[in-house]
């Protein structure tokens, strides 16, 4: 990628069908972990008109009223009106949940003579960049903030005619590798049927777009697409089927970094798809926060049942202050990338996952997002032989 380029990322609201599914899956995970931190959980959710289906594998001593929990999540998201076509009181809740395969458990569980292994093979990436205050790419950061603002003005009745389903997309222009302008903004939001499109466009511009995007990035040629197809009354699970794990680029870096392919929601931290991706973010963010690179991407890989990663590699895109081989050595010295080690380091055996299931797993400032800490930055600078700021 050259130093001058255009880049676009998208996000979706908590009321988008796929995000409803992610939040239900993680709500179930949290409810189980609250009672049984060592549980093995892999829960998938499907949502469609009048229906929520849970399926997967769970091994636990906990008991959860999944029907009540599903209805609570759907209600909190904002599907509380039968006129929308999907609501918390009338939707059916179906479950098809079994136990984790003993063949998998044999390799993952910790015994006296067996260290906890990875829950599956796979490759995971972590990424950070110094272009925003949260060390995330600007396009995905502001795409998230747009749909977060949509939910805020909907729930606080600033724009009471908004409905839960929404999508955003932001196109940034980069020069010398840094974001300098917004070239296009797309905001599609579900709404009540009796609102004029002109009123929707004006309100979205004032209460959402101008509220979120820094004015210095907006210019006379910035293009705005607000509900570009016109009416957006039919939305949510009525308009589209929703499934857990279908928004993995929204969940991570908006396409700016590579992705190993594994989804996060509904998975307990023994699944390295989730926990190692969180650790990858933690490592990359601390490298950037330490000033060892302006951009950093780390890849780790695992074999099922094996504790040690099968590989660790780092790319700094020409922005590193020390060699990438040295960075890998520092990572091996200061971060425990074995499944048990990263679970312990990030304190992942807690009911902290539902908030991750909307508006991105990374770049968040809530205290439960332990992988967003930069507490290793000074240690890395010192180990690299650089003065501590």
Swiss-Prot record:
Cell location: Cytoplasm
Keyword match Mitochondrion: no
EC number: 2.5.1.6
Top-rank lineage group of the source organism: Bacteria
Pathway terms, separated by semicolons: Amino-acid biosynthesis; S-adenosyl-L-methionine biosynthesis; S-adenosyl-L-methionine from L-methionine: step 1/1
Annotated residues for binding of K(+): 44
InterPro entries referenced in this protein's UniProt entry, alphabetically: ADOMET_SYNTHASE_CS, S-AdoMet_synt_C, S-AdoMet_synt_central, S-AdoMet_synt_N, S-AdoMet_synthetase, S-AdoMet_synthetase_sfam
Swiss-Prot/TrEMBL cofactor(s): Mg(2+); K(+)
A biological process term (GO) from this entry: one-carbon metabolic process
Annotated residues for binding of Mg(2+): 18
UniProt: L-methionine binding residues: 57, 100, 240, 271
UniProt key word Nucleotide-binding: yes
The entry's keywords: ATP-binding, Cytoplasm, Magnesium, Metal-binding, Nucleotide-binding, One-carbon metabolism, Potassium, Transferase
GO cellular component: cytoplasm
Chain positions covered by the region annotation Flexible loop: 100-110
Cofactor stoichiometry and binding remark: Binds 2 divalent ions per subunit. Binds 1 potassium ion per subunit.
Catalytic activity from the UniProt record: L-methionine + ATP + H2O = S-adenosyl-L-methionine + phosphate + diphosphate
Stored Pfam families: S-AdoMet_synt_C, S-AdoMet_synt_M, S-AdoMet_synt_N
CDD domains: S-AdoMet_synt
Positions annotated to bind ATP: 16, 165-167, 240, 246-247, 263, 267
GO molecular function: ATP binding; magnesium ion binding; methionine adenosyltransferase activity
Family, as annotated: Belongs to the AdoMet synthase family.
Physiological role: Catalyzes the formation of S-adenosylmethionine (AdoMet) from methionine and ATP. The overall synthetic reaction is composed of two sequential steps, AdoMet formation and the subsequent tripolyphosphate hydrolysis which occurs prior to release of AdoMet from the enzyme.
Name of the protein in its database record: S-adenosylmethionine synthase
Organism: Methylococcus capsulatus (strain ATCC 33009 / NCIMB 11132 / Bath)
Gene that encodes the chain: metK
């Amino acid at each position: 990628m050259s130093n001058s380029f255009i880049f676009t990322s998208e996000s979706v609201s908590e009321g988008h069908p796929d995000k409803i599914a992610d939040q239900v899956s993680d709500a179930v995970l949290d409810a189980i972990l609250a009672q049984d931190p060592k549980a093995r959980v892999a829960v998938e959710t499907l949502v469609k008109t009048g229906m929520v289906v849970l399926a997967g594998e769970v091994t636990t001593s906990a008991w959860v009223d999944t029907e009540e929990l599903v209805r609570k999540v759907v209600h909190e998201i904002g599907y509380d009106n039968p006129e929308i076509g999907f609501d918390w009181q009338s939707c059916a809740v179906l479950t098809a949940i079994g136990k984790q395969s003993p063949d998998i458990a044999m390799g993952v569980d910790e015994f006296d003579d067996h260290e906890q292994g990875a829950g599956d093979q796979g490759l995971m990436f972590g990424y950070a960049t110094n272009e925003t205050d949260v060390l995330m790419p600007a396009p995905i950061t502001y795409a998230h903030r747009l749909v977060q603002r949509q939910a805020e003005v909907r729930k606080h009745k600033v724009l009471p005619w908004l409905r839960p389903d929404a999508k955003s997309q932001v196109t940034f222009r980069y020069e010398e590798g840094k974001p300098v302008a917004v070239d296009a903004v797309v905001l599609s939001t579900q709404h009540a049927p009796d609102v004029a499109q002109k009123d929707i466009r004006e309100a979205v511009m004032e209460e959402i777009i101008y509220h979120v995007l820094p004015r210095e990035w907006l210019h006379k040629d910035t293009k705005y697409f607000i509900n570009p197809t016109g009416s957006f009354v039919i939305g949510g699970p009525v308009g589209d089927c929703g499934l857990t794990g279908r928004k993995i680029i929204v969940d991570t870096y908006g396409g700016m970094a590579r992705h190993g392919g594994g989804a996060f929601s509904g998975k307990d931290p023994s699944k390295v798809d989730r926990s190692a991706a969180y650790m990858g973010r933690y490592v990359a963010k601390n490298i950037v926060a330490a000033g060892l690179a302006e951009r950093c991407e780390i890849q780790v890989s695992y074999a099922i049942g094996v504790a040690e990663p099968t590989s660790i590699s780092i790319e700094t895109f020409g922005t590193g202050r020390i060699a990438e081989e040295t960075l890998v050595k520092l990572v091996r010295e200061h971060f425990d990338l074995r499944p048990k080690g990263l679970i312990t380091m990030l304190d992942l055996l807690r009911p902290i996952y539902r908030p991750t299931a909307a508006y991105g797993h990374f770049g968040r400032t809530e205290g439960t997002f332990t992988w967003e800490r930069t507490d290793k930055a000074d240690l890395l600078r010192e180990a690299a032989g650089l003065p501590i700021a």
